[in-house]
């Protein structure tokens, strides 16, 4: 049983004679209990006493350790040897012992711990609560961890909660900050590449949003020497999304002017076509034999880019693909490569000449190749590989890759005065506009951009239900020395 200090003081002042008698009587009883407890405890009590005495004494003003715990309240006496269950009335002997110990404690000199400097570290112990139990003193123990704080903090900021920070945690945070301040070069390089890729992705997203919003975009370009001028037009048409992409590049390698033009028509999604736009020409110009053996470089680059795309998509469940119809101008030689059903057509001496043949499953040579590889060509609205894909060659298409390859067919054409212009277009144009009609429409327009727009508008008016994208390249034989400048996109 625990008595409040204020109540004891009031009782002592009210009856000093009875308090003196109780003190002498309690002292005699306490000495008897002490002797009995020491004899019963033996060596164990001696060791426990030694361990307890090694700890600093509890500050006498700290009354928190004697407060009754709301959930567990057992009273311990003489190191825990005598316990009283909650609700049991204390005996007269226990009351006398408690009064005697409290009187002795109040009479004993107070030893204060040296005050801790304001703002000093707060030591936190996660060990179970421990305290020094004075023999004959009955008190209740809270199982909460013991926290040692400075007296100045308790007295200077009463009732204020102190935020306790672990020095171990602070040290770990400092180590993390140090590691972040000195990044590894490889990590920096990867971070830079990630930022660059994110920037490119944002630009591509803006372009897609623009096409999806207006459904139409076009533009033009001229070479520095004035020999080439080209225009492009891309129209979403009746489709809900845009899966056609185009690419135009110009560069100088070994003092030779290099120009590259490409149409990429995606199916089952836009990922493959977009990948080709970003990587196909870049890989081609890096090929070691690009200038010396251009045909070999194109063939190997097509296969390499297809393999890299499949690797990049290995973690996904998509299986989209794309065509590729490209024209590469190196000096006075034009190389046209094709995979799929996009097409390249030139106008030479006023005649329409196809420089590529569509890769369709109903082509006798393509059907024989597919069946020799173990594939099947069947009719499903049109002739399809495995009843699924309506073209016999393509980039991507992992599930049909054994039969649907990305090996290009390449045609070489020498540039002479009879070569007037080149048309590259997706099947959204060629399905409704024959080669001869396309050539006739381009002849009417002087500017290649206007000609490209004319082709897409004609295809749409004739009922094309696909995306429509085309590039028109005109060879200006009479303007070899003329000035030129790029033109901006229009929509």
UniProtKB/Swiss-Prot annotation:
Compositional bias (Low complexity): 12-54
Gene Ontology biological process: signal transduction
Pfam (any one): PP2C
Residues covered by region (Disordered): 1-211
Record EC number: 3.1.3.16
Annotated Basic and acidic residues bias: 1-11, 187-211
GO molecular function: metal ion binding; protein serine/threonine phosphatase activity
Substrates-to-products reaction catalysed: O-phospho-L-seryl-[protein] + H2O = L-seryl-[protein] + phosphate; O-phospho-L-threonyl-[protein] + H2O = L-threonyl-[protein] + phosphate
Keyword Hydrolase applies: yes
Amino-acid positions noted as binding Mn(2+) 1 in the UniProt annotation, renumbered to this chain: 265-266
Domain PPM-type phosphatase span(s) in chain numbering: 229-475
Annotated family: Belongs to the PP2C family.
Name the UniProt record assigns to this protein: Probable protein phosphatase 2C 52
Lineage per the UniProt record: Eukaryota, Viridiplantae, Streptophyta, Embryophyta, Tracheophyta
């Amino acid at each position: 049983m625990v008595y409040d200090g204020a109540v004891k003081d009031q009782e002592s002042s009210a009856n000093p004679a009875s308090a003196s008698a109780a003190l002498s009587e309690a002292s005699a009883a306490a000495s008897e209990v002490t002797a009995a407890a020491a004899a019963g405890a033996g060596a164990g009590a001696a060791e426990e006493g030694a361990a307890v005495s090694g700890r600093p004494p509890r500050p006498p003003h700290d009354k928190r350790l004697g407060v009754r715990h709301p959930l567990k309240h057992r009273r311990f006496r003489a190191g825990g040897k005598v316990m009283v269950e909650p609700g049991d009335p204390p005996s007269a002997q226990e009351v006398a012992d408690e009064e005697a110990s409290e009187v002795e404690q109040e009479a004993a000199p107070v030893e204060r711990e040296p005050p801790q400097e304001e703002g000093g570290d707060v030591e936190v112990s996660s060990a179970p609560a421990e305290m020094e139990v004075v023999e004959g003193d009955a008190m209740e123990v809270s199982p909460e961890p013991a926290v040692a704080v400075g007296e100045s903090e308790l007295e200077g900021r009463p009732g204020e909660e102190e935020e306790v920070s672990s020095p171990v945690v602070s040290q770990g945070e400092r180590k993390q900050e140090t590691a972040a301040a000195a990044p590894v070069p490889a990590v920096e390089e990867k971070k830079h590449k990630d930022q660059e890729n994110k920037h490119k992705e944002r630009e591509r997203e803006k372009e897609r949003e623009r096409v999806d919003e207006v459904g139409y975009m076009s533009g033009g370009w001229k070479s520095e020497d004035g020999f080439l001028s080209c225009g492009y037009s891309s129209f979403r048409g009746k489709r809900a999304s845009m899966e056609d992409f185009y690419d135009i590049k110009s560069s100088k390698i070994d003092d030779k002017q290099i120009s590259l033009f490409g149409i990429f028509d995606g199916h089952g999604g836009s990922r493959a076509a977009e990948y080709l736009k970003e990587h196909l020409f870049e890989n081609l110009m890096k090929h070691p034999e690009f200038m010396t053996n251009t045909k070999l470089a194109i063939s190997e680059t097509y296969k390499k880019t297809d393999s890299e795309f499949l690797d990049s998509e290995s973690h996904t469940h998509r299986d989209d693909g794309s065509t590729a119809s490209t024209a590469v101008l190196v000096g006075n030689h034009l190389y046209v490569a094709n995979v799929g059903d996009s097409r390249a057509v030139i106008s030479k001496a006023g005649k329409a000449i196809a420089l590529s043949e569509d890769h369709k499953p109903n082509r006798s040579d393509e059907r024989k190749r597919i069946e020799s590889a173990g594939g099947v060509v069947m009719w499903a609205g049109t002739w399809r590989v495995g009843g699924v894909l309506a073209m016999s060659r393509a980039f991507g298409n992992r599930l049909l890759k054994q039969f649907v390859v990305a090996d290009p067919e390449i045609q070489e054409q020498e540039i002479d005065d009879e070569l007037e212009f080149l048309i590259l277009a997706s099947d959204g144009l060629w399905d409704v506009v024959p080669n001869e009609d396309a050539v006739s429409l381009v002849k009417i327009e002087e500017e290649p951009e206007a000609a490209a727009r004319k082709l897409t508008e004609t295809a749409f008016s004739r009922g094309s239900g696909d995306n429509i994208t085309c590039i028109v390249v005109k060879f200006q034989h009479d303007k070899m020395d003329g000035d030129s400048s790029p033109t901006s996109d229009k929509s």
